[in-house]
Amino acid sequence: MESSEGQVALSSAPASLVQEISALWGEQLGAREVGPEDDFFALGGNSLTGIKIIDRVAQDYGVKLSVRDFYLAQTPTRVAELIEQGRAGR
């Protein structure tokens, strides 16, 4: 992520979680490699794939993401941040 000054912003999610979410997206989207800032929709994501990922996040991490929040997040990094917030009870 970049701030308005062009500096890279640090994610509040652990790098390992971001990697796990990137791998999950790759698995569900049939993509060979998904980067932490890759856009879900640019990768070919759609509503069915989004629901599958949301369900897997609930199963694997115990965090229920809303469809709206998932679609607004758009990247593995931001989804990982939502998972961290959910784990913290925010």
Show where each model-derived region lies:
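Phosphopantetheine-dependent thiolation modules in NRPS/PKS and related acyl-activating systems
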Residues: 1-90
